[in-house]
Amino acid sequence: MKEILIIIILGIVEGITEFFPISSNGHLILINYIFNIDKENIQNIIKIIQIGPIFSIILLFKEKIKKSITFFYFNINNIKKKLILILFNLVLSCIPISILGFMFYKKLEEFYSPKYISYFLILGSIFFILSEFISLKKIKIDNFKKISFLKYFIIGSSQCFSLLPGVSRLGITISIGLILNIDRYVLFKFSMILFSSIMPAVLILEVYKNFFYLKENIFFVIIGVMSSFLTSLIFGRTAIKIMKNTSLIIFAIYRIFIACIILFTCN
């Protein structure tokens, strides 16, 4: 019963934190140390329960996805060059983090400790605050079509930093994008698209690597995934509204607070 409760808590935390630049991995690993979960088990669970938010993101943006599919199906011979470039740039943005993730995933696991998480939470927060001040009073790019090839590539490359637990994929996307003069809501949507594009490949790799563990613990895996899916689906629309206009400084303060708690309680 205790194990089921912990898995549900992990799923709820994943479902909420995935929509904010506060590092879902950092929070899940903090819970690991609170409940004293085996390190190997928590890493397996963290990666697998991210399936939930992926499905919720697809459902939350289903109308836009449906329109895109309909457009391609009925207008295959009339696709505008600009749209093709946008899709190409989105795919290109996934490449840097995919390559580094596959090459160094073993090495990156060494950073899954409270000490490193707290350091990366603080460093990320400092960068978030700086990005808000750098982008102050600039006219923002408010459409995917206006984002240049170079800016797509820079944002995509910056995703590599989010491989470090505590940095936040969403946070690094928005902060780099703000510096590049892009609207924060456009960046939020872009980050969600990147997440739903990259994570399926990562999850396939994790299932392959941990097949026997997952097979033996399939009941807990299902509970964790369902918990994260339902939470992110219920909370997703509210999170989207919050992220439209909320400064990264608010989240940076929270991250520093969490980092201090981790430093003083988990080390």
Curated annotation (Swiss-Prot):
Top enzyme class: hydrolase
Catalytic activity: di-trans,octa-cis-undecaprenyl diphosphate + H2O = di-trans,octa-cis-undecaprenyl phosphate + phosphate + H(+)
One GO molecular-function entry: undecaprenyl-diphosphatase activity
Principal cellular location given in the protein's record: membrane
One Gene Ontology CC term in the entry: plasma membrane
UniProt keywords, alphabetically: Antibiotic resistance, Cell membrane, Cell shape, Cell wall biogenesis/degradation, Hydrolase, Membrane, Peptidoglycan synthesis, Transmembrane, Transmembrane helix
Protein location: Cell membrane
EC number: 3.6.1.27
HAMAP family assigned: Undec_diphosphatase
Function: Catalyzes the dephosphorylation of undecaprenyl diphosphate (UPP). Confers resistance to bacitracin.
More about this protein: Bacitracin is thought to be involved in the inhibition of peptidoglycan synthesis by sequestering undecaprenyl diphosphate, thereby reducing the pool of lipid carrier available.
Name of the featured protein: Undecaprenyl-diphosphatase
Protein's organism: Wigglesworthia glossinidia brevipalpis
Gene this chain is encoded by: uppP
